[in-house]
Amino acid sequence: MAMHEEEEVTAEEEELVEKCIEIIRQEKRASTSLLQRRLRLGYTRAARIVDILEQRGILGPGEGAKPREILVDLDAAV
């Protein structure tokens, strides 16, 4: 799969992606653990959403335990 090619996302996952973007916009930070806590998701599901947001160019790559860099102005994107 090409680096910028996104895996197929279900309608349910897309709804979750939108909720995650809103949380990231409010918190001004992004991490798998933040999404797990705020949305009561398991690690695998939260990590998949973070991967989708990275593929879409919204979040930067992971750097260990540090929060992800937010690459777009989410306030302007609303």
List where the protein language model places each region.
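C-terminal intrinsically disordered, low-complexity extensions immediately downstream
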Residues: M1-V78
